Amino acid sequence: MEKIIKDNGLFIKYNSKLIKNFDKKIFNYDYIEKAALSKSLEVGRARTFELNYENNIYILKHYHRGGFFQKIFRDKYIYTGDVNTRANKEWALLKKIKTYDLPVPEVAAIKVKKYIFTYKADLITKKINNTIQLIDFIKSNKMNDKLWEKLAITLKKFFEKGIYHADLNVNNILVSDNEKFYLVDFDKSFITDNEKYFKKSFARLHRSLVKNIKDKNIENKLLSIKKLIFS
């Protein structure tokens, strides 16, 4: 069940079935660091923590800009309403994807702090246990032909539901110890029926794999799974 807190420019939405004793202090980075509730993670440009709360492990992400505006605005975005914030859009998309029974993290809470014309935002998702990033899984030499095909099938299921992942790369795909693939970090992602976005998403993954995996056979692997996905 979704619960909403509004207080002096603060907008918080949380899943009360997942976090039963919610306290907005879990969005306070100073508090969670001093209380030893978290550890910092290196995940892209966002400030990200692994958070231990109520005997569950969560991923806390603070939204940060990239590209040209990063140095100017850093973590601030133009405010046009709570529903239009990056955090709320990612919340809504993850909830929608869950209804398709696709492998994504469960969203737990979001926070939006409004200023005069701008806002800052955070998102908390439940950690998917016993997983590692695709990049590490491949480097461990566990990625065989069967698993490449399984990855292709997983991506195809997302695309068939019209889900465009805006930053599909080797860090945003997780592999569980039972060899199941998960997609994470859906910031700026959306649902569309335009196939060009799915090809754009796959092209991003292609570049990420070629850049990070020094294997002369990687291009052939990618060509094979591309055929499976878009056939």
What are these regions (language model features)?
Residues N129, V170, K188:
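Short, glycine/acidic-enriched loop or turn micro-motifs at the edges of active sites
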Residues Q133-N141:
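AlphaC helix of the protein kinase catalytic domain
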Residues L168-V175:
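Hydrophobic residue at the +6 position relative to the catalytic HRD Asp in the kinase catalytic loop
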Residues G162, D167, D185:
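Conserved catalytic-loop position in the HRD/HxD motif
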Residues S176, K180-S231:
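C-lobe/activation-segment region of protein kinase-like
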Residues M1-K39:
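Juxta-kinase regulatory segment immediately upstream of eukaryotic protein kinase catalytic domains
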Residues K146-K157:
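Conserved alphaE helix
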Residues K24-I132, K156, E160:
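Conserved ATP-binding subdomain of kinase catalytic cores across diverse folds
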